[in-house]
Amino acid sequence: MIKIKRGLDLPISGAPEQRIEAARPVRSVALIGFDYHGMKPTMAVQVGDRVKLGQALFTDKKNPSVSYTAPGAGVVSAIHRGEKRVLQSVVIDLDGDEQLEFARYPADQLATLSAEQVRDNLLQSGLWTALRTRPFSKVPDPESSPSSIFVTAIDTQPLAADPQVVIAEQGEAFQAGLTVLGRLARVFLCKAEGVSLPGEALSGVTAQAFAGPHPAGLPGTHIHFLDPVGAGKSVWNLNYQDVIAIGKLFTTGQLWTERVIALAGPVVEKPRLVRTRLGANLDELAAGQLQPGNNRLISGSVLGGRTAHGAYAYLGRYHLQLSCLKEGDQREFLHYLRAGVEKHSLLNVFVSRLLGGKRFAFTTSTNGSPRAMVPVGNYEAVMPLDILPTQLLRYLIVGDTEMAQKLGALELDEEDLALCSYVCAGKYEYGPILRDNLARIEQEG
């Protein structure tokens, strides 16, 4: 077991009850272009086209064999584009249950499949996009091979679902998915302390337990300790529900689009786990579930998720949470003179530090305006990786990609710096800054 000591479990109220219920049915689903870094789409459909579940909506110009397939059957109702015609989302109004069939195999033959058979089925079905590389967090090139594949079966994000609850319902499919992934590379199955999961004793699968505060459950943490990456070495990672989907694909020949997500947050009337579907319309999913007022829906974690609004009002491809917060649009009178009983800080600046175990109803307010970056040891307190966070963040801010690489930027994804953004006195958002630097590093070779 690997136990980390540095990090932070955000004391936010509204944690979900770890029991799965059926969610409100949604009428539309979507693929979000923002989820796929560096992807340039070649569209295969247009508005008004009827599509089947698993039918290609677009492919990647750089890797034409990688298909991005429909998460539901119905009619393409909208293709949203932003500045410079960047793809925002492809929306499907659900209608019917037509679906494409893919290759299927008996469960006892999965361990004998070739890597080519596995790749072909994942590519044709669109489940290849469940995989992401590290460095760069992109859908991998089908011609590349990873040093290893990381399966994240632990989740320490605030308000997250317990993976063990979900996997318990789909044990056979999860084990089948691990077997299939083992045909591509060695697999690291990362889990919580004291948890036993299906398939962890399979040949080619190494189970590794992690413990400690967030980010103990992030793939970046697991990769750093088990198989670090660099300019000449890459690994792939995916979450536990995509492993289940892969197992279902290879044993049934059909896409499994069900997702169990946490519907939680301080403004949720009944925080719980809900059974919905990939790319679900979050406005419809949250209807009638929130306290009255001006609330914000976030696809993903409160630390590193994306505001779900307009063209982006759908569950992200890699997200397993719908987090809901009150909009922090009210200024507090003489807030700097208050004791801070209802505010949280990593530093000893509020009385709330004396109230151990207290949960806070966080809002979207940053509690201050942008200012200079001030290193007071807060980054080091939440960074468990063996890097120099203050120095790295400084070089990321000024855009010195050479020094950023030397200090470990290639090991990181936006979510790995989310806690640094939270504790930053200067109110910097380090995730987008990191992404800009990674894009430049990749372009410059």
Curated annotation (Swiss-Prot):
Gene Ontology MF: a single term: oxidoreductase activity, acting on NAD(P)H, quinone or similar compound as acceptor
Protein origin, superkingdom: Bacteria
One matching Pfam family: NQRA_2nd
UniProt keywords, alphabetically: Ion transport, NAD, Sodium, Sodium transport, Translocase, Transport, Ubiquinone
Keyword Transmembrane helix part of the UniProt annotation: no
Enzyme type, top EC level: translocase
EC number(s) from the headed UniProt entry: 7.2.1.1
Catalysed reactions, as listed in the record: a ubiquinone + n Na(+)(in) + NADH + H(+) = a ubiquinol + n Na(+)(out) + NAD(+)
UniProt entry tagged with the keyword Transcription regulation: no
Gene Ontology BP, a term: sodium ion transport
Subunit-level organization: Composed of six subunits; NqrA, NqrB, NqrC, NqrD, NqrE and NqrF.
Recorded family membership: Belongs to the NqrA family.
HAMAP family found in the cross-reference section: NqrA
Purpose of the protein: NQR complex catalyzes the reduction of ubiquinone-1 to ubiquinol by two successive reactions, coupled with the transport of Na(+) ions from the cytoplasm to the periplasm. NqrA to NqrE are probably involved in the second step, the conversion of ubisemiquinone to ubiquinol.
Database matches in PANTHER family: NA(+)-TRANSLOCATING NADH-QUINONE REDUCTASE SUBUNIT A (PTHR37839:SF1)
Protein name as annotated: Na(+)-translocating NADH-quinone reductase subunit A
Gene it is expressed from: nqrA
